[in-house]
């Protein structure tokens, strides 16, 4: 069982921003920007997005699109960037990152520090927007 599966099952706490029967979205604990969110399939632990079956693959992207719409409404940004790396955690996941510039997607840059209170507030704002969709 991966750490992301444990998060989706509620065994490890997270800042949830969206959820449905098949997918879960939560704030990254080491974000590149305010609102940096990870989107995962709940029941598939493969670490390579292109190994997903067609239904899960399409569903994951549709869910990510809805979450990105909520992020854009809740977090001031020019757009929401997308990255699929799959290098650190062996569980398919999509990064949704609020951007002002292309440089905001630099995974090697110094990352901002957010307090637990700030993360909780951001997650609640995104979840509120998600629930409107």
Say what each PLM segment does.
Residues 1-133:
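HIT superfamily nucleotide-processing domains
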């Amino acid at each position: 069982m991966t750490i992301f599966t444990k998060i989706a099952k509620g065994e490890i706490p997270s800042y949830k921003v969206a959820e449905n029967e098949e997918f879960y979205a939560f704030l990254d604990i080491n974000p590149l920007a305010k609102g940096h969110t990870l989107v995962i399939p709940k029941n598939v632990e493969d670490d390579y997005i292109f190994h997903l079956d067609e239904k899960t693959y399409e569903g994951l992207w549709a869910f990510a699109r809805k979450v990105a719409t909520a992020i854009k409404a809740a977090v001031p940004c020019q757009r929401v960037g997308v990255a699929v790396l799959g290098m650190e955690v062996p569980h398919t996941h999509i990064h949704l990152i609020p951007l002002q510039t292309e440089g905001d997607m630099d995974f090697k840059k110094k990352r901002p520090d957010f307090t637990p209170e700030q993360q909780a507030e951001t997650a609640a704002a995104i979840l509120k927007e998600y629930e409107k969709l």
